[in-house]
């Protein structure tokens, strides 16, 4: 509710005639009740009742900061800490700072691995960072990893060019910016922890 209210207060260029869209990269992921129930299987009624109770118990309520609806952003799971909003979106938000969010292997999709063939890695990276020098042994391409507030990747030098962890996440479909990277003749492998942009509330952490 609060998230929707905050969206209603500003116009989005991608959909000027609507307050909220169902594009996960823009506004809000959406699934209709029937499809959600199918995904939940035998837990469908329990989860449906839980959602209905949460809506009813907070009827008419919203979270405000300085009189305005907060940006009630959330994501799936954190790698031990959430990320400061300024590191992801460039704007400092007093209530969206990095905090502990202890989670573990019991969380679905907590660990994932993405291996990118060398030719594909070179093609995608050089399309965005043509100045990168990807000659020599692949293991030598990576240096100077700078951590963010959650211990993930803020930036890393690749072929002598500084690349943001968020850019790598987008380019190679990583689940988060909390990753380690290794490279060999077989390709570049990202070992990823957590799922999502990392800002705000971790759903599994809250659970």
Predicted region positions:
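Conserved, single-site charged/polar hotspot
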Residues: 1-207
